[in-house]
Amino acid sequence: CWSRDGKFLAFEIKRGANQHVTVMPAAGGPTTQLTTERGLSWPYSWSPDDDKIAFAGYRNDLWNIYWISRSTKEQKQLTNYNKLNAFVRYPEWDPSGKRIIYEYSESVGNIWLMDLK
């Protein structure tokens, strides 16, 4: 996904059985892997300040929503789902940066809006 200012791209890169959030300058150049945890990390959208990337992460057999900072690599888990057959995807920041909307489903898709504190 493109950063809002168009200067960076975020994408997942496969390393063995794992997929990690990775960024690179849109004009080309070296890539920077941001996540290191085992599992899947699927980046989807940038925060309004173009520093954080919201992504769906599959870790320890569970899907949750996270963000990670491009500049510091600080990471935060935003949801705490614990059902094995559920999934989350498509996290998108609102223009103010105060909320994230995403899909959560145990069997049929539902749209959730989360306030960030």
Language-model features: locations:
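Short loop/turn segments that connect beta-strands within beta-propeller blades
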Residues: 25-29, 69-73, 116-117
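A short beta-strand motif characteristic of beta-propeller blades
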Residues: 30-35, 76-80
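Exposed loop/turn and edge beta-strand positions of beta-sandwich/beta-sheet ligand-binding modules
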Residues: 17, 28, 40, 61, ...
